Amino acid sequence: MCIRDRGYGEDEYCEAAREKIKTACQAPEADVHFLVGGTQTNTTVIAAILRPWQGVISAVSGHINCHEAGAIESTGHKVITLPTTNGKITAQQVQDYVEWHRNDESTEHIVQPGMVYISHPTEGGTLYTKAELTALYDTCRRYGLPLFIDGARLGYGLMAEESDMTLPEIARLCDVFYIGGTKVGALFGEAVVIMNENLKKDFRFIMKQRGGRMAKGRLLGVQ
C-alpha cells in the first residue's frame, strides 16, 4: 500500500507520536523532535545550545566523553570533565567549577562552561535520585547553564526498582532530554523533548545541518 503524506517529520504518525509523548510527560508545552540515534542526538542538541567558545560539563565517565569517538570535539566544542566514582556529577561539583572559571584571572582564555550533560542511567548503570537531580537542576538554573539529560537508556532507568522518579518529573527537572528508542527495543529513533522555551527556536535548522531530518521521517514516528 502506498501512503502519501508530508515528509521530514511533519506527517500524521510523527504528530501522533509527539502528542503521546507530551501526554506521557505531562508537558503539553514541550517541543518534540525525532532523530535516528544517540550520537546524532547528542551532537545536535549540544551544538544547538553552545556558543563557539563554550564547552559542555560532563562526568569524566560520561558517554559523550568516552564512547562517541570524539563526536562532540569534532564539532569544535570541548567536553569539560568532572571526576566521579559512581558515574554521577553533583550540584556542588558544578558550582565549584563554574565559580573557579568565573574567578580565574585568565577566565577569558579558558573554555567557558555553557551547559551540563548527564545520562540517566549513567554510563556505569547508576541512577540519579530525585533529590540529586533537583539539586543539580537548581544549580544549573542559578548559573544559567542548560541541563541536558541523555536518555538513550531512560526506559531502563525509570523502570529500575531503585528509581524514585517518573517521566513527568524528569521533564520538569531539566531543560532538554531525550527518550531513547534504539537502545530499548525500537528499530531506531530517539525523541528529543525540549522544555526550555529559549532552546526551541530554530531547532529544526540544526537538525537539518546535522543530517537529522529524514525525508521519510514517518519511519521514526511509527516507532
Predicted regions and their residues:
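Conserved PLP-enzyme active-site core in the AAT-like
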Residues: 4-222
